[in-house]
């Protein structure tokens, strides 16, 4: 494994522990894909720093456990935003 990959993996691991941000947000901030962030955190980090990997795993598991709630909230906000922009209520079923 190249040194820059190890460094990035550790940086991302520490960053997610400090901020509790999602993989999607971190990927955007680090300029890499979600797949890369996920692979760094779930496959590479345990080899490099098992203790940090355990902390990260807890955060990822938490995010996974609430993703169905986040998705619903995002949809709700989207329709609310559309309603405000159009000036009339969006029909909901």
From Swiss-Prot:
This protein's UniProt keywords: DNA-binding, Repressor, Sporulation, Transcription, Transcription regulation
An example Gene Ontology biological process: sporulation resulting in formation of a cellular spore
Domain HTH deoR-type, chain residue ranges per copy: 4-75
UniProt-listed InterPro entries: Spore_III_D, Tscrpt_reg_HTH_DeoR_CS
Short name of any one Pfam family annotated for the protein: SpoIIID
Keyword Cell cycle (UniProt): no
GO molecular function, one term: DNA binding
Coiled-coil intervals: none
Residue range(s) of DNA binding per entry: 21-40
Keyword ATP-binding attached: no
General function of this protein: This protein regulates the transcription of sigK, which encodes mother cell chamber RNA polymerase sigma-factor (sigma K).
Descriptive protein name: Stage III sporulation protein D
